[in-house]
Structure formats: structure tokens, C-alpha cells
């Protein structure tokens, strides 16, 4: 049982563990543990494997950029994990925990971050995270179409904020007591 008590409203963000990290169980577990150690609530979690068309749809804003094709192919190269995370400033906190996109820079200016410690290249940089609250809502819907963000904020957020909440190891998600 966890005694999470939050002062401010919780915010949701999407976190992806990319195929390079999921391919290595030690790295995948290390990222999962960093999420828990930084007191994120894991609202939803699933493993999935994209088709190339899924990757193209998700990264359509980057079409025409030099890295687009490499990114599309990489993101459909193997299984990945998707998380809906909650925290008071979830978007910014997850971005801080990930570190800079460019792995070489992350190693120098942000050691201790996921990308600084575990990233391989600028494409194989272990993680993705939403860059704004608006992006988070859009991206959560892309990966979890059955999840209603508005409904969660209205009905579930106050309950997760005040607890009690427990971590269900079998599902790798936090749950409200009694559910």
C-alpha cells in the first residue's frame, strides 16, 4: 500500500519505452524502476508492436525531415511499452527524467537520466515522452484509444491524488484501493 498524497492536481503524460530498450530486459526493467523511484503513478501500461503504418501516423509531423524514415523503421522494428503516467507535473518531470533527445549531449549534461545512462543513439534513445499537456492527450488516445482522458481527470484524478493507492505488480500499474 502506498501513501501517495499530492497537493496539486495530477497531470497525465505518455511515456514510451522504445524497441531498443524493450529488446534488453535489464534496460527495460531499469526504466520501469526509474519511473517507480520517481513517484510516478502508472495508470496504464501495455506492450505492443507497431506496424510501419502506425509509426508513420504517429510521427507524421516529422515527414520530410532527414531522420523520418529511420525513425519510422526503428519504431516498428520490435516490441515497445506504452505507459500513461501521472504526477503533479508529469509532462515536465518525465521529460527531465528522460534527459535530452541527443544521447551524446545527455551523457555530458544530464548523467543519471534515462537517455544519459541507457541511450545508444539519437534514434535509439530508449524513450519518448509527450512535450505538452495537449500532446499527452493526443498521444494517450493514439496508444490507449479505450482510455478517456477527460473522464479520468473528472472522476479518477481526485481519487488517485488523495489515495490510498497500491502498486499491482502483476499488472505493472497503480490501482485505487477497493478496485
From Swiss-Prot:
The keyword Magnesium applies. It holds the Pfam family NDK. Its EC number is 2.7.4.6. Keywords: ATP-binding, Kinase, Magnesium, Metal-binding, Nucleotide metabolism, Nucleotide-binding, Transferase. One of its GO terms (molecular function) is nucleoside diphosphate kinase activity. It catalyses: a 2'-deoxyribonucleoside 5'-diphosphate + ATP = a 2'-deoxyribonucleoside 5'-triphosphate + ADP; a ribonucleoside 5'-diphosphate + ATP = a ribonucleoside 5'-triphosphate + ADP. Its cofactor is Mg(2+). The active site is at 128 (pros-phosphohistidine intermediate). ATP binds at residues 18, 67, 95, 101, 115, 125. PROSITE patterns: NDPK, NDPK_LIKE. InterPro entries: NDK-like_dom, NDK-like_dom_sf, NDPk6, Nucleoside_diP_kinase, Nucleoside_diP_kinase_AS. It comes from the Eukaryota. Disulfide bonds: none annotated. Gene3D superfamilies: Nucleoside diphosphate kinase-like domain. One of its GO terms (biological process) is CTP biosynthetic process. Major role in the synthesis of nucleoside triphosphates other than ATP. The ATP gamma phosphate is transferred to the NDP beta phosphate via a ping-pong mechanism, using a phosphorylated active-site intermediate. PANTHER family: NUCLEOSIDE DIPHOSPHATE KINASE 6. This is Nucleoside diphosphate kinase 6. The lineage of its organism: Eukaryota, Metazoa, Chordata, Craniata, Vertebrata. The gene is nme6.
